Amino acid sequence: MKTILSLFDYSGAWSKPYKDAGYDVVQMDIKHGQDIRWTYYLDKEVHGILMAPPCTAFAVSGAQYWNAKDQDGRTVDAVALIDAALRFVALYDPEWWVLENPVGRLRRWLGPPTHMFNPCDYGDPYTKKTLLWGKFNIPKENPVPPQKVCKQGSWIQKLGGSSDRTKELRSMTPPGFAKAFFDANP
């Protein structure tokens, strides 16, 4: 059985196609009590690694707060999480690996992304420009037009709010993309 590490995966949305197909999915998230900076070596061969680290220090939607986050240490903490995630890649040398984050300043630390997409490129009718870094096969697109559900745009903008629940909903991997990624990277 192939093992997939799914880091920063509270919802399980991105790893769901792998789990449904019978893969051994090791899902890790701080909200499940696992801080990847303190995760010990797993004595198993890892086939692939999915990584969706928190975007709050990097996303362009929060650019007005970047200076404050740089000054108070939140950016350093966020970069440390990226470093810890990439340590898994070096440790396990998987067949493929991918790190996801919305458009923002993460490219300052990781360089140019490997791929960029919107959920509507993979069958989910909304936009949220997302970047991917890593070594993986680019998923086959299944484009649909985005639906505008409010004057701000998609349901993502309509959510608003800063509660944990709305943040979780905004950060969930779109199911169309998750399935397309699985199909391209079995």
Language model regions located:
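Conserved active-site and SAM-binding loop architecture
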Residues: 1-186
